[in-house]
Amino acid sequence: MATNLALQLQVIEPDTDLSSIMIGNSRYSDDVWDLRPFITAKTTNESHKYIRFEYISDADMKETVKQYAYYKLGKMKPQTVRNYINSYLPMFIEYYSINGIHSFEDVTLEDYLNFNLWMKDEKKVATGTGNNSCHVVEEIIRIGFHQPR
């Protein structure tokens, strides 16, 4: 089998030192997670074997996205998680940076609907791309990975 469906990851407790948790060749605290040990398919583009978090400048948002990515790595294929974080989420992060929102807890229904309109009217994204972006955002909010301020 070329890829694990989900990874067996260490459970994070409130007192866990996050810098001690390894994800592939990376530490949880790194801004790039190297997933090459888990993605062995020769046909996978090299750049698709990494989850990149550098595009998220807000520390609380970045931590929430990392928690979500870590959780999802235990549930689905690493490539899918990489797509969620590096293909579908950047538009959301851009929109909320522009609008001064720094926590998933602060996202209102009106904000969410305006994000949808912004993707359609300003970014001119395809319906499928917009749906995928909204799915990831909605899931992060629903699951409830929020950092206290």
PLM region spans:
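Charge-rich, intrinsically disordered N-terminal extensions
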Residues: 1-149
